[in-house]
Amino acid sequence: MAAVKENRLRVLIPQEELEKRVAELAAQIDRDYQGRDLICIGVLKGSVFFMVDLLKRLTVPIAVDFFQASSYGSGGAVRGEVRIRKDTDLPIHGRDVLLIEDIVDTGHTLRTILELLRFRGPRSVRLCALLDKASAREVEVPIDYRGFEIENLFVVGYGLDYDERYRNLPYIGSIEPTKA
């Protein structure tokens, strides 16, 4: 078995700040979707921790679904094409859709997902993103509910990973991979 390389990690957003902001986002979403037919679609895998905490705090009735797309290779390297790995199961035509994402960086993956969802005729599509890496944006993506704006750093924790590691950290940290 190959040795696991250690990486330098520092806390960017502590657990307490995450919990507070998620509660604020849930309250805002509750206000905006009172009396509406809301379907929440999480973008796998990174959004799961955020999505679960957010949905537990909502009081409006919801349906839950998932979508998975990728544009990343091993070690976080960005590839140019967006690949759909898992599509939604529930019909969204005529419904309000809230897409829940962990991080928006270049915007390419989310733009593709949003275009696909809008093509299916929902009543509305809004985006809730825990993290916004605006300085890395290459294409415009409207974020309706934003948790935190962060610098252009590689981040892990609270669902975000580096080679499938660090997802279970209860905070958002920045990581600096060590050289082999």
Show the residue positions of the predicted features.
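PRPP-associated nucleotide enzymes
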Residues: 1-180
